[in-house]
Amino acid sequence: GMWVAVHAHGAEGMKRAVIAGVDSVEHGTFMTEEVMDLMIKNGTYYVPTISAGEFVAEKSKIDNYFPEIVRPKAANVGPQISSTFAKAYKRGVKIAFGTDAGVQPHGTNLKEFIYMVNSGMPNIEAIKSATIETAKLLKIDSELGSISVGKLADLVAVNGDPLDDIANIQNISFVMKDGKRINHND
């Protein structure tokens, strides 16, 4: 069938979407324990987009970046998404990596790993959220998401061990696409 994601901040909208059978909830800012339990029961993924919330919260400190009426809401969204994420992860909601493309500048999406870890997710689980869990969510885990015989050889190699320090994931050594190393200058 069709894959469906819902952009939702409020609990009632999330609840209705999860009951209707969506595959994932994006943002989930004001997710309640009731919604978390429904997501667990239905196998619904949570894509928290913490980096988008943090970016908006940071920009709320700049005069005239947002209309004055929006600034208080923008200031609270980052900490709220982080808090919701921590609760959802601890409760057992399935997590997939996502950053809400277009909110923050291109190339800064790797910060999502740092925010996830700072909110209580172990480094290896943050990495899995961006690999095998996202592949499962998108129903392409037979092709991508893990290193296995028969799967596409799409890899990112980093300098340093991201299991020791998740920030090392930003130190990209090379990228491999379909088994071919992609040179930075190509």
Residue ranges: model-predicted function:
Residues 1-78, 101-103, 120-122, 136-138, ...:
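Active-site core of metal-dependent hydrolases
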Residues 3, 68-69, 76-162:
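His/Asp/Glu-enriched, well-ordered alpha-helical/loop segment
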Residues 175:
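Short aromatic-centered micro-motifs
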